[in-house]
Amino acid sequence: MTMDGVFPLTATVDYCDIFLTHDSASVRKAHNTGWKHKMQVEHYYNAEVDPAKIQSVIDNVTKAYIDAGLPGFPELIAVGVNGQRGQPVGGPPRPPQPFHNGGRPGPPGRPPMGMFPPQRPMMPPPHMRPGLSQMPPGMRPPGPPPHGFMNGSMPPPLGTPVMENGPVAGQQSQAPVAPRIHPDRLRLAGNSIKSKLVIESIYCFYPFGCLDSQIATHTFLYHCANDS
């Protein structure tokens, strides 16, 4: 603060004709999240770039993703006039949806009228349970199943090797699923400079991801001028 009580104007803001009194990341972030700054950015791009040109760049990038078949790209669903979801763009066809004649369906597994299942048989008394009545007197009941077979399944026959913390030998194990990489990172990692310019421009304008970057602004304008 100066002697006359006025803060010095030391920092400028992109897209806005104002100055900040403090040049710090927190002050710039607080300014860039305001509605006035976003409105100035929108007016700046509407005055400098044709909206039809912006949409054509976005459509070209979207089509390039679909043609390349990159993993992790969100499928584009066409919505019909009746509100039902259509077929995904560039994907296999889906089976038709079942037709419901009004009303919500009943609970699953309920039998039709007059076809109720038979009643469950009565439980035998404790002294007549299966498996215990056939045992001779004075003999103790069998103990619990061995470790790893607590769900009631039968243990494998003798001689079958069992893997620790894994499936039984002879069964196929499920292959590990590779982590899905975002298509933007794949595109930026190994493609041409032109594609990188397109992705940078999309990040800069749609949505407002790097509003305080003059370099991304000039990159976007350069690509739009040389795209035709």
UniProtKB/Swiss-Prot annotation:
Region (Disordered) residue spans: 83-127
UniProt superkingdom: Eukaryota
One GO cellular component term noted in the UniProt record for this chain: U2-type prespliceosome
InterPro entries: Matrin/U1-C_Znf_C2H2 (IPR000690), U1-CZ_Znf_C2H2 (IPR013085), U1_snRNP-C (IPR017340), Znf_C2H2_sf (IPR036236)
Gene Ontology MF: a single term: pre-mRNA 5'-splice site binding
GO biological process, one term: spliceosomal snRNP assembly
Keyword Transferase tagged: no
Composition skew (Pro residues), residue ranges: 105-127
Function: Component of the spliceosomal U1 snRNP, which is essential for recognition of the pre-mRNA 5' splice-site and the subsequent assembly of the spliceosome. U1-C is directly involved in initial 5' splice-site recognition for both constitutive and regulated alternative splicing. The interaction with the 5' splice-site seems to precede base-pairing between the pre-mRNA and the U1 snRNA. Stimulates commitment or early (E) complex formation by stabilizing the base pairing of the 5' end of the U1 snRNA and the 5' splice-site region.
Family label: Belongs to the U1 small nuclear ribonucleoprotein C family.
Alphabetized PANTHER family for the sequence: U1 SMALL NUCLEAR RIBONUCLEOPROTEIN C
Name of protein: U1 small nuclear ribonucleoprotein C
Organism placement in taxonomy: Eukaryota, Fungi, Fungi incertae sedis, Chytridiomycota, Chytridiomycota incertae sedis
